[in-house]
Regions:
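…primarily DNA-binding HTH/wHTH and HhH modules…
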Residues: 2-5, 241-264
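Short acidic-glycine-tyrosine-enriched beta hairpin
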Residues: 55-70
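Basic, amphipathic alpha-helical hairpins
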Residues: 120-125, 140-148, 162-178, 194, ...
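Amphipathic alpha-helical segments enriched in hydrophobic/aromatic residues interleaved with Lys/Arg
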Residues: 94-167
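Generic protein-terminus/edge-of-domain signal
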Residues: 1-48, 263
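Ligand-binding loop in jelly-roll beta-barrel domains
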Residues: 71-94, 99-101
Length: 264
């Protein structure tokens, strides 16, 4: 399948201390590995970000954004359509932000400012009111809870093979005991490995994977029931309950808000 290259910003330094970028990427668009002297908050208002940042993989749903510090190499790929928003920050503005790439929880205030700026196509805050909002946004970023990664990956070959199989088949319902047999360890040992390397249980990791897969599936015309069965749920109601716990809304509500967001 052919992929389309995403154009990068064509200047060597930012035209303002805080600069905003907005785009709607279609499925199978990518930005090749690159780096720049400013820091960037990479955010998908709808869809899922797939990024490689300094050799680490990041996938983030709309409640989170990926923070890329200045001079850190990163690339981007969209498996499905993504409503993309980026906040580019001059290095002087980055001093109170993490030194390493990470995932930041996005507050409702930050979402609202980004939505407002995107609706008005504000790239450089020039009005006094917009400059104040931009400062509030920076303050929100500095206070945002830091997470290593929404869907972390393993370093050990055995565990990584399990994760990659599950990512290729998010509807796979095989229990932890099955995967323990595949890598020739006990179920208890594998459970400890999940906790040690990923910071979460097997069940939590698989649920997060399915949530990300659901967000991408909702970009298609498939029904909620079809998506539920594809992701291994025995009923639509079980899938809806999982999605609502993660997103704070039902799949249909998310889909409707996506259609509205694409109009922005």
């Amino acid at each position: 399948m052919n992929s389309k290259h995403i154009d990068l910003l064509d200047f060597s330094e930012l035209p303002s201390a805080v600069y905003f970028r907005y785009a709607d990427f279609n499925a199978h668009e990518y930005a090749a590995p690159h780096r720049h002297p400013w820091g960037t908050l990479e955010y998908a208002a709808h869809g899922v970000l797939h990024m490689d940042v300094d050799g680490s993989r990041f996938m983030s749903p709309p409640q989170y954004a990926v923070w890329v510090p200045p001079q850190v190499e990163h690339s981007f790929y969209s498996h499905q359509p993504v409503n993309y928003r980026a906040v580019c920050l001059d290095p002087k503005v980055c001093t109170d932000l993490p030194l390493r790439a990470c995932t930041l929880a996005i507050s409702d205030i930050l979402k609202a400012i980004l939505k407002d700026f995107a609706a008005r196509d504000v790239k450089i805050p020039e009005l006094d009111a917009d400059q104040r909002l931009a400062q509030v946004l920076v303050d929100q970023l500095q206070q945002a809870p830091v997470h290593e990664c929404y869907l972390p990956y393993a370093s050990s070959p055995g565990l990584l093979a399990i994760l990659e199989t599950l990512q290729a088949e998010p509807g796979n319902n095989q229990p932890l005991a099955h995967w323990a047999l595949q890598v020739h360890v006990s179920e208890r040992t594998l459970a400890r490995q999940f906790a040690r390397e990923l910071g979460m249980s097997f069940g939590e990791w698989r649920q997060r994977l399915r949530y990300l897969a659901a967000i991408e599936a909702l970009e298609t015309s498939r029904s909620v029931q079809e998506i539920a069965f594809d992701l291994g749920y025995s009923s639509g109601s079980a899938f809806i309950a999982m999605f609502a716990r993660q997103a704070g809304c039902t799949p249909e509500q998310y889909r409707r808000s996506h259609l509205e967001g694409r109009k922005v």
